Amino acid sequence: MSNHTQPKIAIIGYGSQGRAHALNLRDSGFDVTVGLRPGGPTEAKAQADGFTVVAPSEAVKSADLVAILTPDMVQKKLYEEVIAPNMKQGACLLFAHGLNVHFDMITPRADLDVVLVAPKGPGALVRREYEIGRGVPCIYAVYQDTSGKAEQFALTYAGGLGGARANIIKTTFKEETETDLFGEQAVLCGGASSLVQAGFEVLVEAGYQPEIAYYEVLHELKLIVDLFYEGGITRMLEFVSETAQYGDYVSGPRVIDAGTKARMKDVLTDIQNGTFTKNWVAEYDAGLPNYNKFKQADLEHPIEEVGKKLRAKMVWLNGQQQAAAAPANQQAA
C-alpha cells in the first residue's frame, strides 16, 4: 500500500452502488478514479459527475484499493482478464457481495488483501443519507489479509461511505453471501412477490374486482413494510387495528406454516451447498433461456396490467419513479 493516509481507490462499475460509493468516498477526501469500458453506458454519467474515467485495466494499475462493483456474472471474466494481470502487488481487492469469492469462481492473487464492504441499502439511499450527514449501516468481512491491514482498509472504506455514522458490523464472506441470497430468494424478492401474486389470484378467482385486489395485497404492502422498517413487527402491530392483529395471529401461521419453513430450509441448503450458484452460472452461460421465460411470465401476470393502470392515476409516484435507481441489468460497467 502507498504511504498516503488515505488509499487511492479505483471504482470499477458505475451503476447504482458504484456511483454512490464513488461520490461518497470522494466527498470523504479519497482520491477516486472510475474504471469503465470506453463508450460504455455509464461513462458519460461518471464524467459529468467530475470523475477521471479510464479503462478498468488502467484504473487498477496505481490503485491501493480496487472495488469491484459490477454485476456478479461479469466479475469472474473481469477479474481474470483485466484486474488480476494489472493490479499492483500488495493492493486491496474489495467486493460488495461475496458470491464469486465464496463459491470459488474468483481465486484472488495471494499477494492481495481481499475484503468485503456492503451497505445495507440501495445506492440512491447510500448517497442521500450521506449528503444529509447520516449514513447507511454497512457490513464488512476479511477474506485474505496479506498485509495485516486488510480489516483497517475495509473499515476505512466503510467509513468513507458514511457507514460509521450508522453502524458497521463484522461478518464473513460465507455469512454475507448465504444470508443475502436466502433473504432475496425466500423473503424479499421470491417469497414476497410469489405471496402477492398468489393473494391477488385468490381474490380475483373468488370474484372480487382486480383493482380492489391490487390495493389489498400489493399497494398497501408498503405501509406495512415501512412500519417493519421503522420498528419491527411489533411496531406494525401497534399501528393496525385489533381486527388486523387478530387476523395476523390466527391466519398468518396458516399461510406460512411448518411446511413453508421446511421448504425455506431447502432453499437455504441449495444456497449453502452451491446448487443455486451452479444452476445460475449454467443458466447465464446458456443465454438465460429460463430466466427470460420467468421474467416474461411475471410481465404477463394480470396484476401487472391492473397495477400499471392504477399507478398512472397516482400522480405522487411520478417523481419517485424518476429518482429510482436503474434496474440491475443496467448497472454494468
UniProtKB/Swiss-Prot annotation:
Describe the location of the KARI C-terminal knotted domain by residue ranges: 172-317
Cofactor binding remark: Binds 2 magnesium ions per subunit.
Q: Which residues hold NADP(+)?
A: Y14, G15, S16, Q17, R37, T42, D72, M73, V74, Q75, G123
Give its E.C. classification number.
1.1.1.86
Looking at the UniProt record for this protein, which Gene Ontology cellular component terms does it annotate, in alphabetical order? cytosol
What does the record give as the reaction this protein catalyses? (2R)-2,3-dihydroxy-3-methylbutanoate + NADP(+) = (2S)-2-acetolactate + NADPH + H(+); (2R,3R)-2,3-dihydroxy-3-methylpentanoate + NADP(+) = (S)-2-ethyl-2-hydroxy-3-oxobutanoate + NADPH + H(+)
Q: Where is the KARI N-terminal Rossmann domain?
A: 1-171
Give, as in the UniProt entry, the pathway in which the protein acts.
Amino-acid biosynthesis; L-isoleucine biosynthesis; L-isoleucine from 2-oxobutanoate: step 2/4; Amino-acid biosynthesis; L-valine biosynthesis; L-valine from pyruvate: step 2/4
Annotated Mg(2+) 2 binding lies at: D180, E216, E220
Family annotation (InterPro entries): 6-PGluconate_DH-like_C_sf, KARI, KARI_C, KARI_N, KARI_prok, NAD(P)-bd_dom_sf
Q: Tell me, what is one Gene Ontology molecular-function annotation carried by this entry?
A: NADP binding
**Cysteines paired by S-S bonds:** none
Q: Which UniProt keywords apply?
A: Amino-acid biosynthesis, Branched-chain amino acid biosynthesis, Magnesium, Metal-binding, NADP, Oxidoreductase
Task: Please name the catalytic residues of this protein.
Answer: H97
Cofactors (names): Mg(2+)
Gene Ontology BP, a term: isoleucine biosynthetic process
Record: residues binding Mg(2+) 1? D180, E184
* Binding of substrate, residues: S241
Which EC class does it fall in?
oxidoreductase
Could you say which protein family the record assigns here? Belongs to the ketol-acid reductoisomerase family.
Functionally, this protein is described as follows: Involved in the biosynthesis of branched-chain amino acids (BCAA). Catalyzes an alkyl-migration followed by a ketol-acid reduction of (S)-2-acetolactate (S2AL) to yield (R)-2,3-dihydroxy-isovalerate. In the isomerase reaction, S2AL is rearranged via a Mg-dependent methyl migration to produce 3-hydroxy-3-methyl-2-ketobutyrate (HMKB). In the reductase reaction, this 2-ketoacid undergoes a metal-dependent reduction by NADPH to yield (R)-2,3-dihydroxy-isovalerate.
Specify the protein name.
Ketol-acid reductoisomerase (NADP(+))
What organism does the record attribute this protein to? Xanthomonas axonopodis pv. citri (strain 306)
Lineage, top ranks: Bacteria, Pseudomonadati, Pseudomonadota, Gammaproteobacteria, Lysobacterales
Name the gene for this chain.
ilvC
